[in-house]
Amino acid sequence: MISIKVLFFGEACQLVGKREEAIDFPEETDYEEIRKTILENYPALQKIEKVMMLAVDQEYANPGDRFELVRFTEIAVIPPLSGG
């Protein structure tokens, strides 16, 4: 396991009550495991679960993506984007 900084933006930040948190993940993991771990740690995010996006090291992540996490990896939880 490795402790990774998870950043929360917009509504995700409001739901969890903080901008960032260190969460433990397996060093070799995938999109689904990252999503599951974050939702287990922050059940309030279930409110936006179907529309939230994840980014790993500033690149959007997609279902099926695999990752080898290292000490300085950052994961971002991004709520639905809106605007015009």
Curated annotation (Swiss-Prot):
Protein name (database record): Molybdopterin synthase sulfur carrier subunit
Which UniProt keywords are given for this protein, alphabetically ordered? Answer: Cytoplasm, Molybdenum cofactor biosynthesis, Nucleotide-binding, Phosphoprotein
A single GO cellular-component term on record: molybdopterin synthase complex
User: Which Gene Ontology MF annotations are present?
Assistant: molybdopterin synthase activity; nucleotide binding
Post-translational modification as stated in the protein's UniProt record: C-terminal thiocarboxylation occurs in 2 steps, it is first acyl-adenylated (-COAMP) via the hesA/moeB/thiF part of MOCS3, then thiocarboxylated (-COSH) via the rhodanese domain of MOCS3.
Q: Highest lineage ranks of the organism?
A: Eukaryota, Metazoa, Ecdysozoa, Nematoda, Chromadorea
CDD domains xref list: Ubl_MoaD
Q: Does the keyword Transferase apply?
A: no
Can you tell me which family this protein belongs to? Belongs to the MoaD family. MOCS2A subfamily.
Q: Where are the transmembrane segments?
A: none
PANTHER family according to UniProt: MOLYBDOPTERIN SYNTHASE SULFUR CARRIER SUBUNIT
* 1-thioglycine, modified sites: 84
Per UniProt, what is the name of the gene that codes for the protein in this document?
moc-6
Q: Cross-referenced HAMAP family, in alphabetical order? A: MOCS2A
Q: Which GO terms describe its biological process?
A: Mo-molybdopterin cofactor biosynthetic process
Report the protein's function.
Acts as a sulfur carrier required for molybdopterin biosynthesis. Component of the molybdopterin synthase complex that catalyzes the conversion of precursor Z into molybdopterin by mediating the incorporation of 2 sulfur atoms into precursor Z to generate a dithiolene group. In the complex, serves as sulfur donor by being thiocarboxylated (-COSH) at its C-terminus by MOCS3. After interaction with MOCS2B, the sulfur is then transferred to precursor Z to form molybdopterin.
User: Which residues in this protein are found as Glycyl adenylate?
Assistant: 84
